[in-house]
């Protein structure tokens, strides 16, 4: 389903997908793209040990440009991650130690790698780290060579920091205020090193991107461009990319492939076709045809399954997708025989509620401990009414004690009350 976007009208195609929030000098950029391949970059600051769904749109945008023949540079902010971007943040960020940030840099670099092709000839991707040019820069060089080109008058008028400057309880430190200069210099540096002429980022990055464009012009007399992707919103106004458990991460150890897949399955009908444009490489024609088919089928829409499949495969590969589908199918059917030990580990991580128990427990106690029932008395009635299954098998004896064979892989027992209420027992 992957499409190669023709370079000359790449911006138009991104706009058709709703992927362009703002762009500097669109005509000149379109003209530059029409002349042949360019190098472009997107920065990822290590503010945690994993990227999350919010990073996925700009990351996939880099991939879209690479598929159209351009050279992507993925910049991990080993230096900027030590400072903290104040853009549209209500409060000062907590500074992390150099060791922590370095650890996160390594993890994020590994996470970005599978999305881009680092070995495809002319337009092979490049991984860069801005610590390489800031790590040994002394303060006088910074103030004379970079600071001299920035007007504080303009900096305090940038939307991204305005609200912080106007709040008495939360000012802005000189550290975070100077972030804008660092990101600006990144652009100038990458322009000089790799001929980068375009920076892409989330729409909250507009102020930092335009600073980089100005600085590159002043330092190298080169015209460069910026393009921002929109911050993703949901039709109901709630925040995208969050669940009750917090952010949806790209690291399978922080959000399991099953939970990730389920996140997309639960997309609202009002959002799903838009999200297919943002997060997949299906053509607009394919997406429109799917929408038409769903509208006329008289059945539940297929779009959520297509979306979940495409994005889970992109992020977790074919194995991750197959595991997520297998777990989904087994929970739905109640038959657990196809589940592997690793599948149960995903469920224990974040797939269903989990409770740890000592061996020798009885079923009534398990139902109370797992909060599937409020009391032993209520548990007794529910068991007797034939509403409880153990590993998919009905159990109607209220006095039941767990046996060795109930412990799958010696560790796991899956309880279900009714059709949909699960709890996984992990035996100590």
Swiss-Prot record:
Q: Which HAMAP family match?
A: Tyr_tRNA_synth_type1 (MF_02006)
Reply yes or no: does the keyword Nucleotide-binding apply. yes
GO molecular function per UniProt: ATP binding; RNA binding; tyrosine-tRNA ligase activity
Domain of life of the organism encoding this protein:
Bacteria
Q: Which UniProt keywords apply?
A: Acetylation, Aminoacyl-tRNA synthetase, ATP-binding, Cytoplasm, Ligase, Nucleotide-binding, Protein biosynthesis, RNA-binding
Which CDD domains did the record assign?
Answer: S4, TyrRS_core
Q: At which positions is ATP bound? A: 242
Record localization: Cytoplasm
Fetch the PANTHER family from UniProt: TYROSINE--TRNA LIGASE, MITOCHONDRIAL (PTHR11766:SF0), TYROSYL-TRNA SYNTHETASE (PTHR11766)
Q: What is its EC number?
A: 6.1.1.1
Residues reported in the UniProt entry to bind L-tyrosine: 41, 179, 183
State if NADP is listed as a keyword.
Answer: no
Q: Where is this motif: 'HIGH' region?
A: 46-55
What is the recorded function of this protein according to its Swiss-Prot or TrEMBL entry?
Answer: Catalyzes the attachment of tyrosine to tRNA(Tyr) in a two-step reaction: tyrosine is first activated by ATP to form Tyr-AMP and then transferred to the acceptor end of tRNA(Tyr).
Family the entry assigns: Belongs to the class-I aminoacyl-tRNA synthetase family. TyrS type 1 subfamily.
Annotated S4 RNA-binding domain residues = 361-418
GO cellular component terms attached to this protein's record: cytosol
For this chain the motif 'KMSKS' region maps to 239-243
Reaction catalyzed: tRNA(Tyr) + L-tyrosine + ATP = L-tyrosyl-tRNA(Tyr) + AMP + diphosphate + H(+)
Its quaternary structure? Homodimer.
Show the Pfam families listed in the entry: SYY_C-terminal, tRNA-synt_1b
Q: Which organism is it from?
A: Escherichia coli O1:K1 / APEC
**What's the protein called, per UniProt?**
Tyrosine--tRNA ligase
Leader peptide range in chain numbering: none
Q: Which residues carry this modification: N6-acetyllysine?
A: 148
């Amino acid at each position: 389903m992957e499409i190669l976007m023709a370079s000359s009208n790449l911006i138009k195609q991104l706009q058709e997908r709703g992927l362009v929030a703002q762009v500097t000098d669109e005509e000149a950029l379109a003209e530059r793209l029409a002349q042949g391949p360019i190098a472009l970059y997107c920065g990822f600051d290590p503010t945690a040990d994993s990227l999350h769904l919010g990073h996925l749109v700009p990351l996939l945008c880099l991939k879209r440009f690479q598929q159209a023949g351009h050279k992507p540079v993925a910049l991990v902010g080993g230096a900027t991650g030590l400072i903290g971007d104040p853009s549209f943040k209500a409060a000062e960020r907590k500074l992390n130690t150099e060791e922590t940030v370095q650890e996160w840099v390594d993890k994020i670099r590994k996470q970005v790698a599978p999305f881009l092709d680092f070995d495809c000839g002319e337009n092979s991707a490049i991984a860069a780290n801005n610590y390489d040019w800031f790590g040994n820069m002394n303060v006088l060089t910074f103030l004379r060579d970079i600071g001299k080109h920035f007007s504080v008058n303009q900096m305090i008028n940038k939307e991204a920091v305005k609200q912080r400057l106007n709040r008495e309880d939360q000012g802005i430190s000189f550290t975070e205020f100077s972030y804008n200069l660092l990101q600006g210099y990144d652009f100038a540096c990458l322009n000089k090193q790799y001929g980068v002429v375009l920076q892409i980022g989330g729409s909250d990055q507009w102020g930092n991107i335009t600073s980089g464009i100005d600085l590159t012009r002043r330092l190298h007399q080169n015209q460069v461009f910026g393009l921002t992707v929109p911050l993703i919103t949901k039709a109901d106004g709630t925040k995208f990319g969050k669940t009750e458990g917090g952010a949806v991460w790209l690291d399978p150890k922080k959000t399991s492939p099953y939970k990730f897949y389920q996140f997309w399955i639960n997309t609202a009908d009002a959002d799903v076709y838009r999200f297919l444009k943002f997060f997949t490489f299906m053509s607009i024609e394919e997406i429109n045809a799917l929408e038409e088919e769903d509208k006329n089928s008289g059945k539940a829409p297929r779009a959520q399954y297509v979306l979940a499949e495409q994005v889970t495969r992109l992020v977790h590969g074919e194995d991750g997708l197959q595991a997520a589908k297998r777990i989904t199918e087994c929970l739905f059917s109640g038959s657990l025989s196809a589940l592997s030990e690793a599948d149960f580990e995903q469920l224990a991580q974040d797939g269903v509620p989990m409770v740890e128990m000592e061996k020798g427990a009885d079923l009534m106690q398990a139902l109370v401990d797992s909060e599937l029932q409020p009391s032993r008395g209520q548990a007794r009635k529910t068991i007797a009414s034939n509403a409880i299954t153990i590993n998919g098998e009905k159990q109607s004896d209220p006095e039941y004690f767990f046996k060795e064979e109930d412990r799958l892989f010696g560790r796991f027992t899956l309880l279900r009350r009714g059709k949909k209420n699960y709890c996984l027992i992990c035996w100590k």
